[in-house]
Amino acid sequence: MTRIGFMSDLHLDSNQFGEAERMQLLQVLQEEQIDHLHLAGDISNNFKQMSLPFIQELQTQLPVSFNLGNHDMLYLSEEEIHQYDFQVQTFGDSHLVSLAGWYDYSFVPEKSKEVHLRTKNTFWFDRRLERPLDDPTITQEVLSQLDQVLASLDGRIIVALHFVPHKDFLVSHPYFQKFNAFLGSQAFHDLFVKHGVRDVIFGHLHHRHSSRVIDGIHYHMRPLGYIREWQLTEDFFKSFPQYKISQMYRLHKRYNAVKGLPEFHQYKRQHLANEFRQALTILDC
């Protein structure tokens, strides 16, 4: 039996991952008896110069696989993106299919494609990517290939992807609802139902959810996310209320107010292992 650990959204550069963080992560993986680690996208903003060296360092300690997220695609050609898509690994009678996924705006159907493009090109990270096709077309091509891959497999199927495959995980806050268009597509869930997929691990949206079953599919969403969003950052202000700011809902501002404090660095060292555990999904295959 192989014990697989899944994580997503490490964002190495934004979270200033160094040797201490890497060693702490390895310690957690060892304590949890992880035999194989899979990273489900958004490892960093520079795949070749940061993500790959990080993965190669981890691979000296245990097998590591990955799929891309949108942040990983920066500076990659479309050919390189395709190279890392649709990897299939077999563990006993279980198959792990990994892919990036994409989005088609269908989570916000009331707005036109033109409106979505204006929003994307004004606010969204993916405006920096140079993909040759439009988003709905990319998604249709990904779905078509995924359909073929899933149809070829027998036994237990596990899918790891980056983007959101079901509307139940969308953002409900009115300001952020327009960005749901760039999170994924319900069409992925429909394919998972069609092919009897057992487990799906994903990230992209930096909210951690308890595992839940929808139409027989076990969904797991526990992204690490940005340090300003971490539980330990939230808890720091409970332990040190004297550092609270007036606009605590402004995650950037509250983190910037404490990131240089010795107390925060010590608190992070004490609680980082637990943060990693909260962002780890474990499946036995």
Predicted feature residues:
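Beta-strand-turn-beta hairpins that frame and shape the catalytic cleft
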Residues: 1-5, 88-98, 103, 108, ...
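N-terminal active-site segment of His-dependent metallophosphoesterases
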Residues: 1-60, 73-75, 124-130
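A short C-terminal boundary segment appended to hydrolase-like catalytic domains
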Residues: 244-285
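Active-site-proximal loop/helix segment associated with metal-binding centers of metalloenzymes
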Residues: 98-154, 163-175, 247, 253, ...
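Metal-dependent catalytic neighborhoods of phosphoester/phosphodiester hydrolases
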Residues: 15-19, 40-59, 70-86, 91, ...
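Short amphipathic alpha-helices and their capping/turn segments at secondary-structure boundaries
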Residues: 29, 79-93, 97, 142-155
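Active-site neighborhood of phospho(di)ester-bond hydrolases with catalytic His/Asp-centered motifs
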Residues: 6-8, 37-42, 64-70, 83-84, ...
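Conserved beta-sheet core of the metallophosphoesterase superfamily
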Residues: 56-58, 65, 92-95, 166-251
